Amino acid sequence: MKRNILSVLIALASIGTACAQETQFLSNNHCLYRIQQKDKCLLLPVQESAEMSNIKVIAGNKQMKSLNVRLAMNKVDYYVPFYLDEFNEEKTLALDIHVNGNYRNDGGISTFTCWKNIKTAESFDTTNHEQYRPLYHHTPAYGWMNDPNGMFFNDGVWHLYFQHNPYGSQWENMTWGHSTSTDLIHWTFQGDPVQPDAWGAIFSGSSVVDKNNTAGFGENAIVALYTSAGENQTQSMAYSTDNGKTFTKYDGNPIITSNVPDFRDPHMFWNENIKKWNMILAAGQQMNIYSSDNLKDWKFESSFGAEYGSHGGVWECPDLMKMKVRGTDKEKWMLVCNINPGGPSGGSATQYFVGDFDGHKFTCESKPEVTKWMDYGKDHYATVTFDNAPNGRHVALAWMSNWQYANQVPTMQYRSANSIPRDLGLFEYKGNTYCSVTPSEEITAARSKKPSKSLSEACEMVVNLKGDATITLSNSKGEKVVMTYKAKDETFSMDRTLSGKTDFSSDFAAITTAPVYGKMNKLRIFIDKSSIEVFDNDGKMAMTNLVFPTRPYDKVTIKGKTKKYAVYKLK
């Protein structure tokens, strides 16, 4: 089946016109590829096990672009588009291609199969050919995706930018991809508006709606800050006057520099308390906090975290927000810190700290040794929130994968999905304050009107609890996921060791366990082909795990004091 799907993908992507081209082989690992025909895109054949090729795009004796692609050596796994219409004013393009490795013994790169299969076309087919692509989660149309970036809401539209590799389904060529949605469920890919430049690849960052034109780019301009990943990591700015469709990079980039090696992922927000912008930025094993009047000139205020929380890996992708504590008149601040590795089940995870922030310094209310995790699954990372979300909501998305195996999961046309949207809040339990995580109202609105007892490959399952329970999802192949709630111990666990395909990484098969702060009365379980996300109905527990069953789970077995459940298809 896998071979047939792959064959169809290759055949569809190959529909096009053979290029009017000239290939000049200069050495065993170096060639020039000249393109005279100007269709919309050049279809590049990719083989994931091949060595990386660096391609310099040259026109009129000027280097226009540089990218890295695993050009097919002896088989074609899939195609990616290189859009020629970026260079409409140029009659001829030359691709200066240098392949890593030494190929003297096998005839050199002139024997690569890519030269027989490369061609131009007027369009690139993004029809899904993947068994595991989810139905109600955001995924890239093609290529690799990791961190969500620059998210904002404006004029009824949710804008999601994301770390995107347009030239392969493994990490490389970091660019900001862009998708939009009116309901947080159905997404439309809008292209790659922020691309690498002389300062480096485009790493993670944030966007804000500048309602009062503080930056001088226009009222309601979209202002983005991102990390330029060059020889050193620096922070750069871009702005949009067409509601995020296109961006202009600021002439004064980079606007923030440092000699700290891991210096990245700026997240900014308007702080009404001080009438200024604040920004939080990962700097090694701590978070730096800045303030600004105009989004261009930033003043360092303080650092947080050197002695707090988990330090098993790199700190990155921060967020900082003020929220009400459920059932009280209190307001507190929550600082989000994503860490890799060092998560509770290994690899990537999202930790958080609750406390106070005066616009200058964050003060954590917990002891330094206390670590709080937002989600206890293995596949919840790079969690950040949308700017300008309606009604004061804090709507978050995460990258649904783990750096332990993200490049190896069994998909090729695309890699990675985002979590379902989640609303964040705060609640108290036994004198401590924790983050509540609940599925956003938009996902509930997507339910079918009538529930059933039959599982589908894309559904929500609601289970009423009256105490201990074991819930098993299984299929005819004997593949299963076992979820266990122990009321007395206040724990919930998920066992995916027999869930389906697990052999692509020794780190994948796992049992994940979460604390539950109080009694659970209802579970909400979201299944979408290759993922299972579980929430306590009141937001006291969240767990996100990928699964790759060879057939969809179609059987539910519940043991315990309750057997009441309902299944809603999601549309």
Name what the model sees in each region.
Residues 1-22:
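Bacterial Sec-dependent N-terminal signal peptides
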Residues 22-64, 84, 91-104, 124, ...:
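Beta-rich accessory regions
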Residues 23-28, 32, 63-82, 111-149, ...:
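Surface loop/turn signatures of beta-propeller and other carbohydrate-active proteins
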Residues 44, 93-97, 147-167, 189-193, ...:
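Hydrophobic core segments of beta-strands in well-ordered, beta-rich domains
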Residues 48-84, 89, 94-100, 175-182, ...:
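Non-cytosolic beta-sandwich-type ligand-binding/adhesion modules
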Residues 53-54, 104, 171-175, 232-238, ...:
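Structural motif
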Residues 177-181, 236-243, 291-293, 348-359, ...:
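Beta-propeller blade signature
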Residues 323-327, 333, 345-359:
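Acidic, glycine-rich loop-and-beta core segments that form the ion-binding/anion-interacting portion
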